[in-house]
Design a protein with these regions (language model features):
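Basic, polyanion-binding surface patches
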Residues: 1-125
Length: 125
């Protein structure tokens, strides 16, 4: 899933927030598994981020296989990390908060990996 809203919540402990629509399969998986990753991508994966990860559900397809992006299991979690991302943040779920038409997913960053020097893309509405 491509997230439009990601923000730091706390430095100690290191917490981040991702805003996810309640209908998203990603939210179901996060609640079930108690962990997630935020893969921050650069221009190399921009079309893939929006075209496959951002617009299609993973309920019926393997998005990683379809995108042909190299991925590996996290070091501190079992979630996939995209090796072509600039940075990957492994997170343990702390809590979810219903907020209007989205759910705020708050996670503690338990590991951060830098894969490249590429500048990350930033979504600007």
């Amino acid at each position: 899933m491509t997230a439009a809203w990601v923000s730091r919540v706390s430095m100690s402990p290191p917490l981040i927030m991702v805003s996810i629509a309640p209908s998203r399969y990603t939210l179901e998986l996060i609640r079930r598994n108690g962990e997630f990753a935020v893969n921050i991508v650069g221009e190399t994966l921009e079309k893939t981020a929006y075209g496959i990860f951002g617009s299609r559900t993973g309920r019926g397809i393997d998005k990683i296989a379809e995108s042909r992006v190299k991925a590996r299991r996290g070091e501190k979690t079992v979630v996939p990390l995209l090796e072509e991302a600039t940075v990957a943040l492994e997170c343990k779920l702390v809590k979810t908060v219903e907020a209007g038409d989205h759910v705020l997913v708050i996670g503690e960053v338990v590991n951060a990996l830098k894969f490249s020097e590429e500048q990350p893309i930033v979504f600007t509405p």
